Amino acid sequence: MYEIKNRKKIYVASKYAGNVDANVAAAIGYCKYVISQNCIPIASHLLYPQMLDDNDPDERELGLMFGLSLLAICDEIWCFGDISESEGVQQEIVEARKLGKTVRYVKEGS
């Protein structure tokens, strides 16, 4: 059990806004992929929208800041899907680089 607790913590970055149902389903799949790689997924966009309103700018910003706090304790950030137009994911990538985290882009079907 000790080995499992010490697996790499991976911050899962993928888009949330837009087609939320499809994006949440995709994020769950990405987390399963991280688990299959013997790592621990951390997906703030599956957590904070459950308690914060993503359509309220103040609450959205709070959720993003909470996510960046989680990113700080992760070993790496893995980016999934088309993230080119996701402002939140781009912010997470910038923060990860500032923190010296490995940024990995995972292609679909990897």
Residue ranges and their predicted role:
Residues 1-110:
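Conserved catalytic or regulatory cores that recognize and/or transform ribose-phosphate-containing ligands
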